């Protein structure tokens, strides 16, 4: 499994009602052993999470299943991350 950094950046039309469904999505990923860590940015402009996936396509699919992406509330960006 490779590590992928997922950035969630709030859009102007951000819907605060998507926060709880987003947390539920992260909980599902954590239960599957695919989430290493996650958290919001201190300025509340968005957040990031570290996702484990077999490929970039798998990571993008998991990140795009996030309600923040599905609702259009946040831009979701995925990068393969060679963290040491």
Please give the residue ranges for each predicted region.
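Conserved, structured core segments of small domains
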Residues: 1-84
């Amino acid at each position: 499994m490779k590590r992928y950094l997922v950035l969630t950046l709030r859009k102007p039309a951000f819907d605060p009602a998507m926060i709880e469904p987003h947390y539920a999505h992260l909980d599902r990923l954590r239960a599957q052993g695919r989430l290493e860590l996650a958290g919001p940015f201190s300025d509340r402009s968005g957040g990031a999470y570290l996702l484990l996936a077999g490929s970039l396509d798998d990571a993008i699919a998991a990140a795009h299943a996030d309600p923040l992406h599905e609702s259009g509330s946040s831009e979701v960006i995925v990068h393969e991350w060679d963290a040491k």
